[in-house]
Amino acid sequence: MKNRVLVVDDAAFMRMMIKDILKKGGYEVVGEAEDGVKAVERYKELQPDLVTMDITMPEMDGITAVKEIRKINPDAVIVMCSAMGQQAMVIDAIQAGAKDFVVKPFQPDRVLEAVKKVIQ
């Protein structure tokens, strides 16, 4: 069975790129969200195996969304995909419960490597 993924980013182009990378890698993208509030709602509704999460988004940022999702499911698997790659931001994301952090702009292989590593 394919692993089910929720893609969260406020940029439609970035969601499309990540979805394309994941589909080519054999993953099933079951949903997407453009902000943290919708990400939490979609997570509850879809219960995906993995979430890719941006940090800087309207309504609710990605780190807050990670914390909210981890309240719903402490075992939630979340990979951050963000241009906010400063060390402090990466540490905040990991402490919030993210399993890995991919810095934009990224190579498709780096996204697949991160997803594969955390989903096993």
Regions from the language model: what does each represent?
Residues 46-52:
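Active-site beta3 strand of CheY-like receiver
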Residues 12-31:
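Two-component/phosphorelay signaling modules centered on CheY-like receiver
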Residues 106-115:
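C-terminal output helix
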Residues 57:
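Receiver (REC) domain active-site loop signature in two-component systems and cognate sites
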